[in-house]
Regions:
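Intrinsically disordered, low-complexity regions
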Residues: 1-199
Length: 199
């Protein structure tokens, strides 16, 4: 018999967890900002996250700076303050690249693509898409490849480059065909045909 039994105090209902407040006031401010953001209270989220960002900068806490900048980017994106969103995302991206955090780099870059598309900086958005695409292809990630190719097609359409968007859709169809997803492949080929007939 073992003595390594879980104490009764630590057992709770499934899905029910106690939310403990972080002991660090900066982290508490950051978490509060995230809650405001989740509740679409963007003004309060911006204040809390900005305060956390200032505090993280004073402590030279790069992880905190990256996280707060990323969340502030989300707030600005939701408020359609695209230039501010871009600045926050670029700050987060620089820190993620410095620490070589590949997953965070991809997540932030996808947001940067969205922001640059809203700003009609299509060439920059497409360059970022190609960087993301390289990562997915290097890691042999067909799902990620398809997702970013769809994003590229949308950017091409907004940029008025329908033929390139059609090429992206044909590439997506080819990937799906390789995995015997014939119905999905047919839908993307149809999108490509529609775009080329509109050109």
């Amino acid at each position: 018999m073992t003595d390594n039994l879980q104490s009764f105090e630590s057992i709770s209902q499934v899905g029910k967890t106690e939310t403990k407040k972080p002991s660090d006031p900066l982290q508490a401010e950051y978490e509060e900002g995230k809650k405001y953001l989740a509740n679409e209270e963007y003004g309060q989220a911006a204040v809390a996250l900005h305060n956390a960002l200032v505090g993280f900068k004073e402590k030279n806490d790069e992880v905190g700076i990256a996280n707060a900048s990323n969340q502030l980017g989300h707030v600005c994106l939701a408020r359609k303050e695209y230039e501010n969103a871009l600045q926050h995302y670029l700050q987060a991206l620089a820190i993620c690249e410095k620490s070589n955090d590949r997953m965070s780099i991809l997540a932030v870059m996808k947001k940067i693509v969205t922001v640059r598309t809203h700003l009609k900086k299509y060439d920059e958005a497409l360059a970022d898409c190609l960087t993301i695409l390289d990562h997915y292809q290097d890691n042999r990630d067909p799902q990620g490849t398809v997702t970013i190719l769809e994003e590229m097609a949308e950017v091409y359409i907004k940029a008025g480059k329908k033929e390139k968007a059609a090429d992206a859709y044909r590439t997506i169809a080819s990937i799906h065909k390789n995995f015997r997803h014939d119905n999905i492949a047919a839908k993307f080929l149809e999108k490509a045909v529609q775009l080329t007939s509109e050109s």
